[in-house]
Amino acid sequence: MMNMETRRFDKKDVKEVAELLKNGQVVAFPTDTVFGLGVIYENEEALRKLKESKGRPENKPIPTMVADVEQMKCIAQMPAEAVALADAFMPGAFTMILKKQETLPDYVTNGFPTVGIRMPDDPFVLRLIKECGKPLLVTSANRSGEETGVRDEQVLEQLDGRIDAIVLGEAKGKLASTIVDMSEIGRASCRE
C-alpha cells in the first residue's frame, strides 16, 4: 500500500527528529513503555497519515503526550484533583482522561468530549516534545491488531516503508500505562 523510505535516526538527533515532526512527518521512537508512533499535535493531515500507516480505525482517538502540566492545561480542563494526580504520578506510565478544552480541535479526539494525556518518564521523549514546542499524538508503533514492539527491529518489520522515520533503540518495556478517567470529578475509574 504505502511505500516510502523510512529514515533512521539516533537519540542524539533530537533536533532533526523534532523538525520532521513539526513538518507533519510520522515518526516511531522508543518510550518508557513500548515503541511509540507519533505526530505533532494540531496537524490533521499528519494524524491521518499516522492512522493510515498503522491501519488504525478512524474512530479511535490517539493519546496525547505532553512534556509538563502546563501543556496539559492547554488541552484539557485540569481540576485540582487532576493536578494533584499529575504531580504524584507523572512523568510515568500513567494516562489521565480529562475533559478537553473547548479550543481542542475535534479531530484530535475523534469528536469525543475527553482527551487521554500522558507524560512519559523518558528523557529523550520529554526533550523531543519540548523541541517540538507542542504535545505529540502518540500510539503504539505497530500495525493495528499486531504485536507491539519494544525494539526498533520489531517496529521496522511491521512499519518499514509505511512511516517517515524511526529513532533507533529499545523501549524500556514496562507494562502499558495505567489509565485513570478523571473526566467526571467525583467519579474516577481506573484500568491497567
Please annotate each region the language model reported.
Residues M1-R191:
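Active-site-adjacent structural elements in enzyme catalytic cores
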